[in-house]
A protein has these predicted regions:
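Conserved anion-binding
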Residues: 2-3, 63, 67-137
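Conserved alpha/beta-domain cores
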Residues: 10-49, 59, 65-68
C-alpha cells in the first residue's frame, strides 16, 4: 500500500526557525515545503543547495513557457527537489515546457499544477474578471 505524503510548511525567512521545524519533525518523516518567502530569503537558496533530503519547492511559477523553463534551468543544481509547483494558468504549452525542464533536474520530480490560490473566493475572482465560481475553476 502506498503511503500518503505529508508536508510541513517552512513558511518563514528565518533560517533558525526553518532548522527548528525540520529538527522537530524529522522523526515523522515529513517532507519540508519551502515557498517564495524562504526561497527568496537571504539564506534560502544556499540552504536548499546543501539540504540532503527531498523537499517540496512551492514557487507557483507563472509566466510564458520559455521563461518558466529558463527559470527552472537556473535552479538545476537543487537536485533534491521532489515536488515543485506551477500555476496551471500558464496553459498546456507552459505546463509541458515546465515538466520537461523539471525532469532534467530530477527524473522522479512531481510537478503540481496550482489551479487557484486558497486565498481567492468568488468575489475576488469576479474582481479579476473570472465569471465562474471557485468550485468550477
Amino acid at each position: 500500500m502506498k503511503k500518503n505524503k505529508i508536508f510541513v510548511a517552512c513558511d518563514t525567512s528565518n533560517i533558525k526557525q526553518v532548522k527548528k521545524i525540520i529538527n522537530h519533525t524529522k522523526s515523522y518523516k515529513l517532507i519540508p515545503k519551502f515557498g517564495l518567502q524562504f526561497f527568496y530569503s537571504k539564506h534560502g537558496r544556499n540552504f536548499l543547495e546543501k539540504y540532503k533530503s527531498e523537499f517540496f519547492l512551492d514557487l507557483k511559477c507563472s509566466d510564458i513557457p520559455q521563461t518558466i523553463s529558463s527559470a527552472l534551468y537556473s535552479i538545476k543544481d537543487l537536485k533534491k527537489i521532489k515536488y515543485i509547483t506551477v500555476m496551471a494558468s500558464v496553459g498546456l504549452k507552459g505546463l509541458i515546457a515546465f515538466r520537461k525542464q523539471a525532469l532534467k533536474i530530477n527524473k522522479s520530480i512531481i510537478v503540481c499544477g496550482v489551479t487557484i490560490l486558497t486565498s481567492l473566493n468568488d468575489k475576488s475572482l469576479r474582481e479579476i474578471v473570472y465569471k465562474d465560481k471557485v468550485e468550477k475553476i
